[in-house]
Curated annotation (Swiss-Prot):
Bilayer topology annotation: Multi-pass membrane protein
Annotated gene: ELO5
Highest classification ranks of the organism: Eukaryota, Discoba, Euglenozoa, Kinetoplastea, Metakinetoplastina
GO molecular function, one term: fatty acid elongase activity
Pathway where it operates: Lipid metabolism; polyunsaturated fatty acid biosynthesis
Gene source species: Trypanosoma cruzi (strain CL Brener)
Active site per UniProt: H135 (nucleophile)
Matches recorded under Pfam families: ELO (PF01151)
Purpose: Involved in the synthesis of fatty acids. Elongates C20 polyunsaturated fatty acids (PUFAs) with a preference for n-6 PUFAs.
Keyword hit for Lipid biosynthesis: yes
Protein name: Fatty acid elongase 5
Transmembrane segment boundaries: 24-44, 60-80, 100-120, 127-147, 150-170, 188-208, 214-234
Subcellular location: Membrane
Regions annotated as coiled coil: none
Entry keywords, A to Z: Fatty acid biosynthesis, Fatty acid metabolism, Lipid biosynthesis, Lipid metabolism, Membrane, Transferase, Transmembrane, Transmembrane helix
């Protein structure tokens, strides 16, 4: 049976509301240490790989992609029932189920950092964009902030759900192409990623007016963060399109 609490009860706890025993995982030492450590690791690994040949990571990538597909599917399916509770679950009640799966989603952001490690070992330096590093160095920190302040709940479920659903599609694509197959829907996947950011911007814009459980600063944080992601992703997509066009032009000369 689902367990619910009023949002005000969770605010007063100033910690995970239903699972306080997990607070250690969203402590400042973990939040700051893990994300600063990520940036330091990127710098060290890139320097270490400078004079080394690219490594064959095919088997590891296959295991990694399958793991990501499985975890993303479980999170998306587990959070999906809350989609029926109104638009973005605005003013939705705080539940143990949402908090648990948002915590799992938060933990998955640390697994996502392995994307960067794989890119560096494979010497895919063109993929190590500012957008990529910025996203991985910040998204887990933001989810951790929500959880440690007792508001990783309610309408916040939507961000975790839509991101899990998109990640399921993304890692399915990566697995498919790693097996040597071509995905004709790759361009659609890019549009889906951008639509995800757009939906989160809409949610953050509506929350101050239709959700009285979230303080304005949290909606503002989500709004500004997803606007930066949308702009950076749009710029990266535009530049990638230009580079692809130049490569195609050279091949026809």
């Amino acid at each position: 049976m689902e367990v619910y609490l009023d949002a005000t009860e969770c605010y007063l706890k100033n910690s995970l509301c239903f699972y306080p025993s997990l607070n250690i995982f969203v402590s400042w030492s973990v939040l700051v240490g893990a994300h600063v450590g990520y940036i330091v690791l990127v710098i060290i690994l890139r320097k270490w790989m400078q004079r080394r040949a690219a490594l064959n990571m095919n088997k590891i990538m296959m295991i990694y992609n399958v793991t990501q597909i499985y975890i993303s599917a479980i999170m998306a399916i587990s959070l999906a029932p809350h989609l029926k509770k109104g638009l973005f679950n605005l003013n939705g009640r705080f539940s143990a189920n949402i908090e648990f799966w948002i915590f799992v989603h938060y933990c998955s952001k640390f697994l996502d950092m392995f994307d960067t490690v794989l890119m560096i070992f494979r010497k895919k330096n063109e993929q190590l964009s500012f957008l990529h590093i910025y996203h991985h160095a910040t998204i887990g920190f933001i989810w951790g902030l929500l959880l440690r302040n007792g508001i990783g709940n309610g309408t916040a479920f939507f961000g975790a759900w839509v991101n899990s659903a998109v990640h399921f599609l993304m890692y399915s694509h990566y697995l498919w192409t790693s097996l040597g197959f071509r995905n004709p829907l790759k361009s659609i996947l890019t549009k889906i990623q951008m639509f995800q950011f757009f939906l989160c911007i809409v949610q953050a814009s509506l929350a101050p007016f239709f959700d009285n459980q979230f303080a304005l600063q949290w909606s503002f944080l989500q709004l500004t963060y997803h606007i930066t992601l949308f702009i950076l992703f749009l710029d990266f997509h535009r530049k990638s399109g230009k580079k692809k066009g130049l490569r195609n032009l050279k091949q026809t000369e």
